[in-house]
Amino acid sequence: METTMTRRDFLKSAGAAGAAGLVWSQTIPGTLGALEKQEIKGSAKFVPSICEMCTSSCTIEARVEGDKGVFIRGNPKDKSRGGKVCARGGSGFNQLYDPQRLVKPIMRVGERGEGKWKEVSWDEAYTFIAKKLDEIKQKHGAHTVAFTARSGWNKTWFHHLAQAYGSPNIFGHESTCPLAYNMAGRDVFGGSMNRDFAKAKYIINMGHNVFEGIVISYVRQYMEAIENGAKVVTLEPRLSVMAQKASEWHAIKPGHDLPFVLGFMHTLIFENLYDKKFVQKYCTGFEELKASIEPCTPEKMALECDIPADTIKRLAREFAKAAPKAIFDFGHRVTFTPQELELRRAMMMVNALVGNIERDGGMYFGKNASFYNQFLGEEDPKAKGLKKPKTPAYPKVEVPRIDRIGEKDGEFFLANKGEGIVSLVPKATLNELPGVPCKIHGWFIVRNNPVMTQTNADTVIKALKSMDLVVCVDIQVSDTAWFADVVLPDTTYLERDEEFTAGGGKNPSFGIGRQKVVEPLGDAKPGWKIAKELSEKMGLGEYFPWKDIEDYRLQQVDGDLDLLAKLKKDGSASFGVPLMLQEKKSVAEFVKKFPGAASKVNEEGLIDFPKKIQLFSPKLEEVSGKGGLGYEPFKYKEEDELYFVQGKTPVRSNSHTGNVPWLNNLMEYDAIWIHPKTASKLGIKNGDAIELYNKFSSQKSKALITEGVREDTLFGYFGFGHVSKDLKRAYGKGVNSNALMPSFTSPNSGMDLHVFGVKVKKA
């Protein structure tokens, strides 16, 4: 059943949001507000899909409800999220119908960053882009164009287009957020790890604020653990919501997480609190690890992290006593120290030392089809993976990536080629990268906003202004699109179908991706279609042989119509039964389901790991001399500066949702947290206009005086201070903290650094 909603109906339904700034604007070419008439057509039945208001990708259902707009709720079939959505997820309808969203292609007619645009047809936009890409290819080589896409399904299409074009320089957003913990997982465990928070009895949390960053499944698990009596200890410089929920909050010195973890680990090892049997059977490199951290006593590390040695030792002893139902949470955004790879490896090693791997209330391997199948007998049915549709081989590229990922002895050998070290793109453009294989002449950016998400925004803007071509695919004129030559209008997540995905928690599963709830508004197109049509204009159509997204999906499931129908109806499908390799009851249930797996069970009724856990990295030792662990002091700020740290708010998603009317109305700017003693010394009172400044930039905001932050530290929420004047609600409000950050790339991990120094004064 289809429901049609006219522009008059829409304006009527939007009236309730008038106070939130939902004004029908005629000032921005190519926007929904510039259309004279628009019918909104969609399903009156609930359609299972995936939210895209942040990168957590929660499962949802949505439908059109007459003249009331689109109703969004959590998918009730998803037990991990309990059928819930957060404030951001609930505002998806508001983003869909935002008059300031882009629904037609636009091209720059003034200087970059001047904000002068004209509407163009898709054919005109494609022709311009294809011609410019060919010119760069002929003059400088295809490898001099970088392609960046935010993590998600759009990345599939545009990274494929990039490699068909001949560029190896494809990037995601990970080096500005979670890359180091993914690298650490590959180094220590050989792959990704999941956390069973709900069954844990003791959790150490170092700034992984799931209550404000909001991952609904994690929120529910943490709350279940707390309600069941688990002890949660939080270490971070400010009193976050996570810290408020915790049993203990310790205000650790910014950027000094690693000394705490090393002192904690030192206690486990040198007081013989670790699980000797587990380490001996399943781990390698223990003696090398022990030797590397011997100097890192709790007493020495306490002087660095500002947590007393007695506290470090007490927490380690309590943690070991609670194991294996104890988790040292390795976090998500990992941009706090130049030694991020060492820090995240250390956190993961702590879990291995207490033997919590593949245990209830501990950590476990993500079990996709290939991982799961290795424990099945020959006669047992196997979990299916998704097939990748066949395409021609990519052209051979002779020039290495600018980050040299893929080279045998490259510094960032643990990084994924599909993510890369994106912060190197501006440096390679401006010739600020010693030994770079090439200069970047063009940047194709898909639903990513480096002006707001990369450090030292002025450098990013300078790089954008110097390029031969900048193309953005987005739903709005973002801060980066503000400096583009062409902006192509992507659909919102409620207007498109996407590819299927395969993954696994405790057993393999498939996901629907996203399903279209309403027809695209204006002339917006989904990413798969933009990439396919542009490839045809570029003479690369053979690389996109599928007719449409439905054809692509059918090839993914190898023509399995039953699986196709189930995924479209339910939104997900799983295989087998949950498996925890070191839990006898789970292994017994697994063997009951798959009798052939009995041959994999050891004398203890458990299943051994497929490979050893690595507590010392021979490859890292070879490349950087850092196979073990150790602490290297770093100067984050000058003596007369304060530390600045940032975090997420539950009503903003990085730089993505600042202009969404409802969310902007909930939080227009980010007041900066200042300790009362610090504010008193500076003559600053609550609510005063203030200026933050250092040698890189200056930003203005308001003061929030609170004891919930260290005296030597300022705190602000991320996602404010937008520079695009076409984001009319969000422009110029609050602090873009990235503008104040130095351009620093952490060794071995390639992470940006989000802890830095600033001065503050009354504005």
UniProtKB/Swiss-Prot annotation:
Pfam families: Molybdop_Fe4S4 (PF04879), Molybdopterin (PF00384), Molydop_binding (PF01568), TAT_signal (PF10518). The keyword Transport does not apply. Predicted to be exported by the Tat system. The position of the signal peptide cleavage has been experimentally proven. It comes from Wolinella succinogenes (strain ATCC 29543 / DSM 1740 / CCUG 13145 / JCM 31913 / LMG 7466 / NCTC 11488 / FDC 602W). Component of the phosphorylative electron transport system with polysulfide as the terminal acceptor. [4Fe-4S] cluster binds at C51, C54, C58, C86. CDD domains: MopB_CT_Thiosulfate-R-like, MopB_Thiosulfate-R-like. This is Polysulfide reductase chain A. The gene is psrA.
